[in-house]
């Protein structure tokens, strides 16, 4: 990389050199290894590769954000290794760190990446007190969060572009969203932001310390907490894998993911191994992602996520799903008009000729009779331009549309684009949301992981045709040999969105929870709706409280509209409520 002018000293912008090196590698049309020297490389967005792209779970069809800047772009290539050589890549502004587009056998390895000015401000409450009858807080701000005090407000300036002289992003006071981190307790949760209520004065004390005086009299009780504040637009993915096959991320430090996480979209075989998704301890920050860490949407083959750390996201660490498109028209006997229904997802193709689909009734979330067909033609968005409508598509099948299909009452899932999944030997901590979300009909194994202090369900299984439209059912899910410490209940939550619940027609099937350790407070361990075949065996459940505390009241098991439930050979501490509630 240095031969093309990249600067490992970190004094100059290496973007043009990185772009030139990757373009040359592409021109070679053979297996290639692109290598950095050990050092620090600055990467600015102004001269980065730019592509019009539409990405799942981000900004949908919003034309303000259609052009994405990409620091490291592997495009229309095969057999490529990006070897960081232990380098630190520092990204500036709003850009995707790296992407694989229409490529095969791609490995990103052996580097750390960071953003100079994250879109999240981690404001630590250094101290609190009362002076002359009025409360105050003193905030400590990390170095990567420039600011200016304007009267009784704080303007967050988000780093100045050397090209325009303007900040890459900006906001005021609490921005648009807040979550709270307790570094001592090692917990993070979503909540209200009291920092900017009842303000009397704001003073810049220098050295990145700000004093806020209030009109109120009570001393704030949040000294030591960190208010993680951000905007809400997911303008680009942190990293992007699209229409690619056999892509690996290995031995990396992902210190921060700007605007969103790693998105795998309509690709095949994605592996994430030994990736440390966590902030640099020296940075003073506690946030490592603007939203999710890993989002897999419409991926097929195998998704493998192993030996990694997930610490400090602003949404779910791992979410693996497809997309339900709603039937909104029937232009012909063998064709349907389908629509994206959630505003964050649009603009890219969901189907290709040869893909198999399943027709699902929204109210029951179960397949229609004669529910499968094969796609023969698609007229819809390309994912890389806006020449056609971005929220609808017309899909033609190899057979007449089933009689039970209803406009606005049926959704369609691409069941070819569903992966088998292995999530093994990972650590999840400081998570404000769920730990793992997974909805795929292929085999799923979640094993050897440690979930500590999740603020919502540690493992969540949905199938949603009413809000997020994230598909589909699970048919073979094994949760084995994990530890769940200090969880929020329910620890394992199965919640499809079916409005009609019939135990004879469950949405999900064959879920096994075995040989796990649960160290719990007074919470429900399993809350499962519409499951046919649920086994909870050979698990150990221990109370966090000592024996002299009162017994817990929450039932360990709650089932709704489920059948073939087996709970056996588990070990329970005294004082747990081993009731099974079923309706």
Residue positions per predicted region:
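Acidic Gly/Asp/Thr-rich repetitive segments characteristic of extracellular carbohydrate-active
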Residues: 1-35
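Extracellular beta-strand-rich solenoid/capping regions of secreted or surface-exposed proteins
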Residues: 19-28, 42-81, 90-109, 117-135, ...
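Short glycine/acidic-rich loop motifs that flank beta-strands on beta-rich extracellular proteins
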Residues: 31, 91-97, 117-121, 235-238, ...
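Solenoid scaffold repeats with emphasis on beta-solenoid/beta-helix
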Residues: 34, 72-75, 80, 87, ...
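Ser/Thr/Gly-rich low-complexity blocks that favor extended beta-strand/coil architectures
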Residues: 91, 115-117, 126, 142-204, ...
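Small/polar beta-strand repeat architecture
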Residues: 182-234, 369-372, 378-422, 429-430
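Alpha-solenoid helical-repeat scaffolds
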Residues: 190-284, 292-296, 303, 309, ...
């Amino acid at each position: 990389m240095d031969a093309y002018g990249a600067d490992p000293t970190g004094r100059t912008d290496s973007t043009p050199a990185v772009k030139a090196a990757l373009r040359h590698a592409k021109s070679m049309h053979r297996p290639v290894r692109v290598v950095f020297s050990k050092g620090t490389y600055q990467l600015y967005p102004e001269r980065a590769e730019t592509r019009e792209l539409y990405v799942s779970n981000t900004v949908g069809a919003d034309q303000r954000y259609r052009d994405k800047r990409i620091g490291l772009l592997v495009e229309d290539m095969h057999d490529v290794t990006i070897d960081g050589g232990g380098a630190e890549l520092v990204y500036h502004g709003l850009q995707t760190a790296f992407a694989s587009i229409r490529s095969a056998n791609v490995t990103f390895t052996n580097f750390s990446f960071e953003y100079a000015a994250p879109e999240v401000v981690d404001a630590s409450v250094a101290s609190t007190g009362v002076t002359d009858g009025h409360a105050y807080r003193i905030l400590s701000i990390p170095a990567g969060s420039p600011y200016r005090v304007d009267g009784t407000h704080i303007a967050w300036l988000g780093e100045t572009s050397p090209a325009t002289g303007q900040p890459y992003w900006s906001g005021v006071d609490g921005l648009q969203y807040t979550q709270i981190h307790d570094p001592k307790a090692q917990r993070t949760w979503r909540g209200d932001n009291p920092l900017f209520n009842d303000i009397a004065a704001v003073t810049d004390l220098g050295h990145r310390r700000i004093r806020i005086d209030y009109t109120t009299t009570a001393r704030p009780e949040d000294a030591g907490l960190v208010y993680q504040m951000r905007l809400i637009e997911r303008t680009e993915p942190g990293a992007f894998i699209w229409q690619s096959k056999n892509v690996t991320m290995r031995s990396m430090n992902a210190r921060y993911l700007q605007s969103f996480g790693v998105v795998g979209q309509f690709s095949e075989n994605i592996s994430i191994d030994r990736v440390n998704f966590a902030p640099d301890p020296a940075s003073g920050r506690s946030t490592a992602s603007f939203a999710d860490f890993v989002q897999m949407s419409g991926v097929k083959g195998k998704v493998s996520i192993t030996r990694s750390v997930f610490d400090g996201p602003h949404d779910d660490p791992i979410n693996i799903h497809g997309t339900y498109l709603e039937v909104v028209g029937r232009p012909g006997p063998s064709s349907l008009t389908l629509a994206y229904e959630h505003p964050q997802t649009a603009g890219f193709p969901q189907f290709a000729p040869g893909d198999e689909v399943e027709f699902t009734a929204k109210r029951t979330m179960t397949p229609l009779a004669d529910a499968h067909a094969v796609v023969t033609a698609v007229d819809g968005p390309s994912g890389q331009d806006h020449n056609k409508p971005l929220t609808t598509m017309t899909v033609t099948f190899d057979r007449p549309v089933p009689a039970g299909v209803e406009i606005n009452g049926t959704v369609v899932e691409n069941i070819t684009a569903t992966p088998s999944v292995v999530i093994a030997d990972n650590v999840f901590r400081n998570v404000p949301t769920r730990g793992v979300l997974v909805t795929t009909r292929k085999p799923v194994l979640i094993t050897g992981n440690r979930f500590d202090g999740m603020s919502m369900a540690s493992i969540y299984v949905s199938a949603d045709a009413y809000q997020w439209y994230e598909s589909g059912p699970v048919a073979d899910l094994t949760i084995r040999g994990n530890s769940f410490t200090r969880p929020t209940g329910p620890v394992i939550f199965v919640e499809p969105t079916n409005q009609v619940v019939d135990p004879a027609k469950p949405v999900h099937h064959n879920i096994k929870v075995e040989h796990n350790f649960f160290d719990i407070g007074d919470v429900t361990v399993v809350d499962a709706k519409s499951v046919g075949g649920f086994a909870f065996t050979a698990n150990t459940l221990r109370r966090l409280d000592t024996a002299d505390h009162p017994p817990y009241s929450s039932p360990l098991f709650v089932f709704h509209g489920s059948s073939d439930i087996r709970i056996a050979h588990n070990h329970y501490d005294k004082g747990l409520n081993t009731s099974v509630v079923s309706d």
